[in-house]
């Protein structure tokens, strides 16, 4: 079974910018904190989805459900 991929999505409602995949949620959460420059309050919206100050940290399955254009580990876009 492949390891789950996690993504950091900035500006989800206007111009979504999706990061490269992270191997675990902890790496993705740390990356989202670095975008803001400080640790902000985390709001768990649903399974595999956390909002941090207007940034979404979610799994590949959630990102595909929201129809964001995401990349795999080789840099190819998922269909």
Predicted features by range, described:
Residues 1-2, 50:
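A generic structural signal for short, non-catalytic loop/turn and secondary-structure boundary residues
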Residues 17, 30-79:
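Short, mixed-charge low-complexity intrinsically disordered segments
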Residues 2-3, 65:
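The identity of the second residue at the extreme N-terminus of proteins
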Residues 4-13:
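A short beta-strand micro-motif
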Residues 22-26, 57-58:
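Conserved aromatic
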């Amino acid at each position: 079974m492949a390891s789950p991929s996690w993504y950091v999505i900035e500006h989800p409602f206007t111009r979504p910018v999706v990061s490269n995949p992270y191997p675990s949620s902890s790496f993705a959460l740390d990356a989202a904190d670095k975008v803001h420059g400080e640790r902000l309050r985390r709001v768990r919206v649903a399974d595999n989805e956390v909002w941090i100050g207007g940034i979404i940290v979610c799994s590949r399955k959630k990102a595909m459900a929201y129809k964001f254009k995401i990349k795999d580990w080789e840099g190819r876009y998922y269909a």
